[in-house]
Amino acid sequence: MKKLPWSELHQGFSAVLSSVNNIETVISYGNVLAEHESITGRAALIDLSHRTRIRVTGHAAAYDFLQRIFTNDIPRPGSFKCCYTFMLNPQGNIITDAFVFNWGDSYIIDAEAGMVDKLLDKLKSQASNDINVSDASGSVGILTIQGPIAQDILEAWLLGEELPADVFSAVKIILPDGKDVLIINNPRTGTGGFDIIADVESGPLIVRRLFKILGALDCRLAGWQAFDIARFEAGIPRFGSDIDPSVIATETGLAEKAISSTKTDFVGFDVISRHSNPNSMNSYLRGLRLFNDIQVLPQKGDLLEYDDQVVGYITSSLASPKFHANLAFGYISKDFNKIGNILTLRSMNFESPAQIVELPFSKNFV
């Protein structure tokens, strides 16, 4: 298991550490439900440094390279901005999703945990000699503050500094130790939030300062488990569970967010252009509400049927503490994926109705 950069720091806060995709991760600080409530009701600080971080340098050449590799418009050098995007193969299948941050003269690719070797091989095999691609897991960390009052926490930390107002906009801040950090407006759980990209050496000072502010504002540290529950409740699919290489990008419901409407030269464009119309897609990722009386949540691959015909399958599920309901994601054939349709979920031990609902899930619990 690969160690987390700030492992000892978190142990001082009584963190529960375990593995996500063979990477050490802060799972919780001992009270997942309280941490989740802090994220959704006020705000919480989460260490996302278990995720893959890759640095790409090469000035204009790096920008041109990433523009070809990724589906969305990459921030220009020196813009200090971010985008959410896909990396595709020529068949239009998703290799990974990622956030790509411009950090002055370099780019940081932030992807799902455990993807370092795969993405390094993929990027290095296509990069020219004037582009450097390296593993940044040991040198760069990612913290995120998520929740309705996330901005209040940052304002209390960065007195007088102007924060990025628009989603995916960013600002560079110089810390008292002379190190610079990147602050990005990035609502990862649907209620507002900011990422903090910092050198590993600066992390402990940042966390300790923010910890004091959290306490003063009745907020707390939160682990990956609470963060992932909030992410699910916000209707945001996760790579490895709801998005994987078997899926064409346009089937995920994320095309508007992750794919440029003007670029035509990225890998996989020809396939994506043929599947831009919903009628051309075989299936589509939908949210599902399951009946409350089921005893066991469905597993990835459990089938969805309509009139005894298999029309889809489950990708992930959750007993939501926020909505007090059983929820799921699943891919459903285009002829049966209308909002409101009621399907039959067939699991190993039971069958149950499953209703297709709008995303984000909050729209169904007004």
Model-derived regions, located:
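A generic structural motif
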Residues: 107-110, 192-198, 325-333
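Glycine-rich, small/acidic residue-mixed loop/short-helix segments
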Residues: 90, 247-366
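Glycine-rich, acidic
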Residues: 3-29, 132-285, 289, 298
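Acidic, proline/glycine-enriched N-terminal capping motif
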Residues: 1-88, 92-95
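Short amphipathic alpha-helices in soluble, non-transmembrane regions
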Residues: 69, 121-125, 157-159, 206-215, ...
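A glycine-rich (often HGG/GG-containing) alpha/beta subdomain
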Residues: 61-104, 146-188
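Helix N-cap motif at beta-to-alpha junctions
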Residues: 59-60, 112-117, 148-151, 199-204, ...
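A common structural junction motif
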Residues: 73-74, 124-132, 161-162, 210-222, ...
